[in-house]
Curated annotation (Swiss-Prot):
GO terms for molecular function: ATPase activator activity; protein-folding chaperone binding. Residues 3-75 form the J domain. Interacts with HscA and stimulates its ATPase activity. The keyword Chaperone applies. This is Co-chaperone protein HscB homolog. Co-chaperone involved in the maturation of iron-sulfur cluster-containing proteins. Seems to help targeting proteins to be folded toward HscA. GO terms for biological process: [2Fe-2S] cluster assembly; protein complex oligomerization; protein folding. Belongs to the HscB family. InterPro entries: DnaJ_domain, HscB, HscB_C_sf, HscB_oligo_C, J_dom_sf.
Length: 173
């Protein structure tokens, strides 16, 4: 797939205008909809189907802050992420992440919905702060630091999913 920003004719930047993204998505889907190619050759039908799939994939990248940041870094550096290398470089954050997991375990054992809600709010606030820092670093073209924060966002995403699973368990009781 080609650059998702160029496919949607958007500037390569972290902040996205969601209304513009939706508008461009609908236009591209209309342009490459397989029904428009029903009377064309099999090759043209296949090409339209692939283009439609590329549009859908690009949309998912542009909508997800982690995937969008990763794409920006790869476009500007030509370097594909090495997840293991980043993890070794960010030991302080990994220690913090482990502490958050211990706190989540403690909250789960105490079965306190109120503590869990407060913890989720805290983690989402931390995540938003990292997203803001990431946007700044991307604008400043500090790719290596931005890549590190992108990895942090991956951890936040996983932690939030785990918190939501604990929340579901607590609601079942």
């Amino acid at each position: 797939m080609r650059n998702p920003f160029s496919l949607f004719n958007l500037p390569v930047q972290f902040q996205i205008d969601n209304a513009q993204l939706s508008e461009r998505y609908l236009a591209l889907q209309k342009q490459f909809h397989p029904d428009n190619f029903a009377n064309e050759s099999a090759d043209k039908q296949l090409a339209a189907l692939q283009q439609s799939a590329d549009v859908n994939e690009a949309l998912q990248i542009l909508k997800d802050p982690i995937a969008r940041a990763t794409a920006i870094i790869e476009i500007n550096t030509g370097i594909v992420k090495n997840l293991e290398e980043n993890s070794r470089q960010d030991l302080d954050f990994l220690m913090q992440h482990m502490e958050w997991h211990e706190k989540l375990d403690s909250i789960e054992n105490s079965r306190s919905e109120q503590q869990l809600a407060g913890f989720l709010k805290q983690i989402k606030t931390e995540q938003r702060n990292v997203e803001q820092q990431l946007a700044t670093l991307l604008n400043q073209q500090q790719w290596q630091k931005a890549d590190l924060l992108t990895e942090r966002l991956r951890y936040f995403k996983k932690l939030i999913i785990q918190i939501e699973k604990v929340e579901e368990k607590l609601l079942e009781y």
